[in-house]
Amino acid sequence: MNEERWNRREILAGIAAVAVAGGRMNAEGAVQQRVLGRTGEKVSCLGVGGSHIGKPKLSDDDATRIIRQAIDHGLNFMDNSWDYNDGKSEIRMGKALRDGYRQKAFLMTKFDGRTKDSANQQIDESLRRLQTDHLDLLQFHETIRFDDPDRFFAPGGAAEALTAAKQAGKTRFIGFTGHKDPHIHLYMLELARKNNYQFDTIQMPLYVMDAHFRSFAKLVVPEAQKMGLGILSMKSMGSGVILKSKTVAPVECLEYALSLPTSVVITGIDSQQVFGAAKQDGAGGQ
């Protein structure tokens, strides 16, 4: 079998692998749900990572099958971004969410524009690619430099675009992401308080080695909890670097992130590591 093509059994194996971690499937065989912070929305504890969906190793049909099979088995949280794979990730997800699947999904995307004008342009482009008139969650992407929070809240900055998008009904909820330094996240939250600006979600890397260096779990998660934010976890496997040590399995990495007060752990269900774990754990037939 061509390793770059996924059939129905393999897709289900991947879903099963991430869902069985810690008993994350309910009695009906669907992935369990968690509450997304103060929004009160119920979302799947595992999310489909949009970055993987647009990669060349997958065809458009592969991407559609993965997304729809995931939704059919309770993974309703869809992650994406304006800049993933030059827009291909959003285009593929938009096609996959036709035929009634958009109504079953909790759809999130992100934008990179630092100014109001550039952000507005990217938001509208994302809506067109995703073939929808609104998002469930829209996030400011890659808060990774210490001046990013200042730029976000500056006059004419992206904060104005995010607020306008919510007021116009282009998104139900708003948040921000970053993966570089927990102190940048904390500074963003500090400026949000000073500006009386209310985020609904916060996204950050949470993985097994996090506690040893620039720990988001120790520094940011408690603050996010105090503010009632929905906590989104990414990079649970350290972009694959952690797995190269062969000291932990993919499912163990996922279980660590799920053990934290996260609402959603975003992962690439099409990855070789996940499918390998499914076969190893005997979950392929479930």
Q: What name fits each language-model region?
A:
Residues 47, 77-79, 136-139, 175, ...:
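Conserved beta-strand positions in the central sheet of alpha/beta enzyme cores
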Residues 143-286:
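Beta/alpha (TIM)-barrel catalytic core signal, keyed to glycine-rich beta->alpha loops juxtaposed to Asp/Glu
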Residues 51-60, 110-116, 244:
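Active-site mouth loops of central-metabolism enzymes
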Residues 58-70, 117-129, 182-190, 250-253:
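Short, acidic/polar
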Residues 130-148:
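Active-site groove signature of glycoside hydrolases
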Residues 2-105, 161, 167:
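N-terminal binding-site loop/beta-alpha segment at the start of enzyme catalytic domains
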Residues 37-40, 94-102, 127-132, 191-196, ...:
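Acidic (Asp/Glu)-rich catalytic clusters
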Residues 36, 48, 78, 93, ...:
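Conserved, mostly hydrophobic/aromatic
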